[in-house]
Amino acid sequence: WLRWRHGQDREWLAATGYPLVAEVFRFYRANLVEGQDGCLHVPLSSSPEYRENQSAAWASDPTVDLALIRRCCDWVSEMEQALDRDDLSAAAEQVRARLAPYPLTDRHELCLWSDRPLDESHRHPSHLMPIHPAMDLTVDDGDDARQTIDASLEQYLALGRYRWAGHTYAQLASLAA
């Protein structure tokens, strides 16, 4: 998507970019399940590097997956518009509208997944994906979004740097910007 966004190369978009993103969307759509709440849910996935990928790291609706699916839906629509196509845009808009909301704590912090707030220092802030790089929650989205952004960053920083790696600092610099 970034290659398309910055280069605006329609030939590359038609031959490579759009087919790749369309296939990713089809995969997501085929693997989502409708819950009793009427929302579409990720049945099972993990939050990267949390709990060394053991069974405690696996659950439904990881925030990172929800953010990536939302962004993929946006990319499908944007790319189809650029290519004057309308193959998947309606389906992408429907999936995005029905996708489960981001799980939040009572303090409005983004969770790793439903009922699992970040509970330890962690080098991979994947649960912050809706803020950056997905940019699905921005300070321009109103008071609720700003509250979630502020609370989530404060929580991440409060848990300390014990398990951070070099890339963690770069990610947090991008988040803070």
Residue ranges and their predicted role:
Residues 1-10, 15-18, 63-177:
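Active-site core of glycosidic bond-cleaving carbohydrate-active enzymes
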Residues 23-79:
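Acidic/histidine-rich catalytic neighborhood
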